[in-house]
Amino acid sequence: MLKEYIIPQCHILIKIGKKDHMQLLLNEGEVYMNSTEFFRTNKNEEIGDEYEGAMCIKNGKVSDSRENLDFEKLFCMWHINNINPVHDSLIHRIEYDKESDSTRMTIDLRKLSNFTPNEESYAVVINNVREFNRRFKLACEKNKLQYHGNKVVKYYDPEKISEETILTPFWKRNSYDKQQEIRYFIEKADKEPLELYLGSLNDIATIINVNETAIVVQGECR
């Protein structure tokens, strides 16, 4: 039986990973950003995608890629809001709560925990998205980084997308749509991962064990 972490609003960010990494994110605001090239060549099917970095798709295949993929630094998180509903595969149950006269949706994050060994899957749940975004932008300004903002990922079907469509780092194949990503994009002219520190997030986030706790959204979110 999973414990419940109840969220009163339908706008959250979630980062899943190993416990020590998630504690660094919560306590120090450590944002670890890998490059598009890292994601393009990673063999873990939950993380890597050979179509990352694609600029154009023709007949379902990558016909052209962007340059300097090592310079594109990405921070990716799972997200939900009132516009982007939760993927059906992640919904454990939906029920009506008479006492609060609202809908309760239980989300099972174990379906996303293949990012790390199952017993080590922890999640940082960010409840104040606007404040997180403000701190992220501020950290970029302090470090004089070329920040291109954050966007919800647009998922595409490689068999149907037009050859004329120019893809950006905010596009991804629809076979990954359950990840419901929002991406933060920085350009930095070196090949190393980028570490950015936002400061403690304890006032706007919490950490949970994915294998012990389900997310419960109290209110309409579909």
Report the location of each language-model feature.
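NAD-dependent ADP-ribosyltransferases
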Residues: 1-222
